[in-house]
Design a protein with these regions (language model features):
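Preference for protein termini
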Residues: 1-199
Length: 199
């Protein structure tokens, strides 16, 4: 762990060299800035992570159910759960998609759910990003560089892998491909059985 922390500057230097950046809008203008790496990891026990994961799966399934309803039967509006003006005047509502049902009824295939943890340890959802969530590559390259900088940290601790993300993403996309044949991919540490229907 000490070697990981001591190599923070070197890891951030490599991230800058590789051009790992993220974009933000400020005062109506788009800006890019380097992705900062914090070498002190947030350690989440396996049982707690499993509970968070189950909650996120449930949440994404609920969000997809909401999108299916808002573009088809619109019961959530008819029942007065949300006002009609609020739903259909939103910049995120796409009239061209009205009455459109994608394969398997999945509207959001990749979801970026931002989480925060309170002082008492409770996790909260900060926001749901369903349009074009970015940032999947950040933990992948950060983990790769961290392993290179401090291999003993990962050797001496049980750390869940994340390098099968590409395989899981492909499986998720293949699952909603109406023309697919049997294309299931095999990963030695695949977590497919725990994936939500919308990935």
């Amino acid at each position: 762990m000490d070697s990981l922390i001591s190599n923070t500057a070197a890891i951030n230097g490599l991230l800058a060299r590789f051009g790992v950046k993220f974009g933000i809008y400020k005062n109506g203008e788009f800006h890019e800035q380097l992705f900062p790496y914090d070498s002190l990891p947030r350690i989440i026990p396996a049982d707690e992570f499993a509970e968070i994961e189950a909650g996120l799966i449930q949440r994404v399934d609920a969000l997809n159910a909401f999108l299916r309803d808002i573009y088809t039967e619109k019961r959530i509006v008819a029942d007065g759960v949300i006002p009609e003006d609020f739903a259909f005047s939103s910049s995120g509502f796409l009239p061209a998609c009205d009455n459109f049902v994608p394969p398997n009824g999945i509207y959001s295939h990749i979801s970026g759910i931002d989480l925060v943890q309170a002082k008492d340890g409770t996790w909260y959802v900060l926001e749901d990003n369903l349009r074009i969530p970015s940032g999947a590559s950040y933990p992948l390259i950060a983990r790769k560089l961290a392993r290179r900088a401090s291999p003993e940290t990962f050797k001496n601790n049980s750390v869940d892998r994340n390098d099968d993300y590409g395989l899981l993403l492909r499986e998720a996309m293949e699952s909603v491909n109406p023309d697919r044949k049997s294309t299931r991919l095999n990963s030695s540490h695949s977590r497919k059985s725990r994936m939500p229907s919308s990935a």
